[in-house]
């Protein structure tokens, strides 16, 4: 009898032992860099036919709220066609060149990059209307998974990545993403050691002497959405210094002078921070958390690129975007501001409430500043062009004035797709109450999708774009 009664315990312990063998995926090392291969913006240019317009979508963080809202933007662009003066119809969705994604927005960005139009067949059922949060919690609470969670380097985020892979990405890696012909997808996480923004693209992985192509998309999404404390950091290996990496030629002007060119000062600081990865012996591991910690809008890379573009124009150097006439940026911000009644009570809010608010407020303020910086850049370029084209200005008379007014010719369109742009105050109130989680009611998902399309069509900046290109909208 004693033998029979102990059998379940033996089986249970055996299963625990089997499950304790989980180890985190290791990004492979490369011995030599080839800048003409791998998943990077430069190699994706072969699929671009329209060099006059650069269309960028920036998807913010915010759990399923962000994933659904950004998906609504894709749906709207899918069903919106611009009809040019010649009668040719252009689907806005096909004009997208770059999508940046943070946290919840990274899922929609990566999934669209992988599946293209097929995403519209089942994204709702596979992800948006699924209790992803509950599935993660269920596995964490399953005793069979505890040994894996206790093992070195394999935490809750690795378990979440496995779930993301099962329900959405089907084992796809960046090599699979690179085989597609869609827009360049750049999702970001945050290096918790120094606070740097780390994008999942081969140009950055060159510094690590690592092959991004072997990295599962699910791990990139897990890193980008690894909310501190709630989920564990995602660890990647750094082999920097072992593959003869050198800085790209275009960065040399920024490092040859001790006085950083003003427009690109922030971008240069970011480049310097990334250069720190070249010493893999000193920093063999990089621990990544939610991308929203460093850039919740996915706009930092866009702003850096514009600043560098402006700096190149200042020094009279050519850039890959010199042919661009328009830079069109959809800032898809799912930030919600749930109302509180704290100020109506003498008793202060609890510790947990204060902690959540204290971490969110700086991120929200930084997001606001990022949008304003973009608008400042847009206004500055326009002002310099107007001065340069003014009858009062004579080119060649004053070299200093020529240099100051040497602004990029491209017109920037900053289309703000955020809850605050909704004219329906009742709908705004509803969306602002939605939590940041990976489980929302189906009704909430549908209303988020519908709101995104409505905001775009009613946007004054979108109407300006439509008028400037002389196109009409067909839905």
PLM region spans:
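Bacterial N-terminal signal peptides that target proteins for export
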Residues: 1-9
């Amino acid at each position: 009898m004693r033998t029979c009664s102990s059998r379940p315990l033996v089986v249970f312990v055996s299963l625990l032992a089997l499950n304790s063998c989980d180890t985190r995926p290791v990004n492979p090392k490369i011995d030599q860099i080839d800048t003409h291969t791998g998943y990077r913006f430069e190699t994706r240019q072969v699929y671009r036919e329209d060099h006059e317009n650069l269309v960028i979508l920036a998807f913010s963080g915010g759990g399923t709220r962000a994933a659904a809202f950004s998906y609504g933007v894709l749906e709207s662009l899918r069903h919106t066609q611009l009809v040019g003066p010649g009668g040719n119809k252009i689907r806005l969705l096909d004009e997208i060149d770059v999508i940046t994604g943070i946290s919840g927005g990274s899922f929609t960005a990566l999934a669209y990059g992988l599946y293209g139009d097929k995403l519209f067949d089942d994204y709702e059922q596979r992800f948006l209307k699924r209790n992803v949060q509950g599935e993660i919690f269920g596995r964490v609470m399953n005793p069979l998974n505890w040994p894996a969670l206790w093992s070195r380097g394999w935490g809750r985020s690795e378990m979440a990545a496995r779930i993301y892979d099962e329900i959405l990405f089907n084992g796809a890696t960046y090599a699979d993403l690179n085989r597609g012909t869609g827009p360049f997808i750049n999702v970001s996480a945050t290096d918790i050691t120094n606070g740097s923004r780390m994008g999942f693209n081969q140009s950055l992985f060159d510094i690590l002497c690592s092959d991004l192509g072997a990295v599962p998309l699910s791990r990139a999404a897990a890193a980008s959405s690894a909310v501190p404390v709630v989920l564990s950091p995602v660890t990647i290996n750094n082999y920097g210094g072992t593959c003869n990496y050198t800085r790209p030629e275009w960065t040399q002007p920024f490092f040859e002078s001790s006085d950083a060119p003003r427009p690109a000062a922030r971008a240069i600081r970011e480049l310097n921070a990334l250069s720190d990865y070249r010493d893999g012996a000193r920093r063999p591991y990089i621990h990544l958390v939610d991308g929203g910690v460093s850039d919740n809008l996915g706009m930092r890379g866009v702003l850096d690129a514009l600043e560098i573009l402006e700096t190149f124009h200042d020094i009279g150097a050519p850039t890959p975007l010199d042919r661009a006439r328009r830079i069109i940026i959809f800032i898809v911000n799912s930030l919600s501001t749930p109302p509180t009644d704290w100020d109506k009570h003498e008793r202060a809010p609890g510790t947990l409430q204060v902690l959540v608010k204290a971490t969110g407020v700086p991120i929200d303020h930084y997001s606001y500043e990022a949008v304003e910086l973009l608008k400042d850049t847009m206004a500055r370029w326009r002002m310099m062009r107007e001065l340069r084209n003014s009858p009062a200005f004579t080119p060649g008379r004053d070299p200093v004035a020529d240099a100051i007014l040497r602004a990029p010719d491209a017109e920037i369109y900053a289309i703000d797709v955020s809850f605050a742009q909704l004219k329906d105050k009742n709908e705004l109130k509803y969306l602002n109450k939605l939590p940041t989680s990976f489980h929302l009611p189906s009704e909430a998902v549908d209303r988020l999708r519908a709101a995104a399309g409505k905001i775009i069509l009613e946007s004054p900046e979108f109407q300006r774009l439509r008028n400037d290109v002389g196109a009409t909208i067909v839905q």
